[in-house]
Amino acid sequence: MSSRTVGSLRHRVRAAALQALFELDQTTHDLDSVVARISDDEMFSAEGRDFFARIVNGAWVNRQEIDDLIAKIAPSWPVHQMPGVDIAVLRIALFEILYDAAADKAPVKAVINEAVELAKHFGSDNSGRFVNGVLSTVVNKPESEE
């Protein structure tokens, strides 16, 4: 598969993951049923289904730790008051950067760029800048401060 095809697949998967995480956060729907339904609706390839399930499950399972990290980095913005799109985008990106151990893991810069693009497209006028600021702080933070 070409890098352009992989990139567009990952973009589609991340956009669908944003939808799934937003839905999970706003409803009482079951994780497995949301993942199955959206994955079926999107008609992903096997590779796309695997990536989708990995990032949605990973971001959702690790959301408390991810949210705690966001709260430390952006104390003026309580996580429970953040727009749902922003928090979903941050959960996806921070899962990929900090928790994803897959061999085909995307480079950090690619994850940040994609997160900023998703935030700009689906979020408010300030979402892209906010997401970029949080992710840049995480990536540039010395390990001794974590």
Swiss-Prot record:
Which residues belong to the signal peptide in this entry? none
| Single GO MF annotation | RNA binding
Keywords for this entry? Answer: RNA-binding, Transcription, Transcription antitermination, Transcription regulation
Domain of life of the organism in this record? Bacteria
Q: Which Gene3D superfamilies match?
A: NusB-like (1.10.940.10)
User: Its Gene Ontology biological processes?
Assistant: DNA-templated transcription termination; transcription antitermination
- Whether Kinase counts among this entry's keywords is no
Give a yes or no for keyword Thylakoid in this entry.
Answer: no
Which InterPro entries does its entry note?
Answer: NusB-like_sf, NusB_fam, NusB_RsmB_TIM44
User: Gene Ontology terms, cellular component aspect?
Assistant: cytosol
Pfam family of the protein (one): NusB
NCBIfam families referenced in this protein's UniProt entry, alphabetically = nusB (TIGR01951)
What family does this belong to? Answer: Belongs to the NusB family.
Tell me, what does this protein do in biology?
A: Involved in transcription antitermination. Required for transcription of ribosomal RNA (rRNA) genes. Binds specifically to the boxA antiterminator sequence of the ribosomal RNA (rrn) operons.
- Protein name, as recorded: Transcription antitermination protein NusB
Query: What is the organism of origin for this protein?
Result: Herpetosiphon aurantiacus (strain ATCC 23779 / DSM 785 / 114-95)
Q: Which gene encodes it?
A: nusB
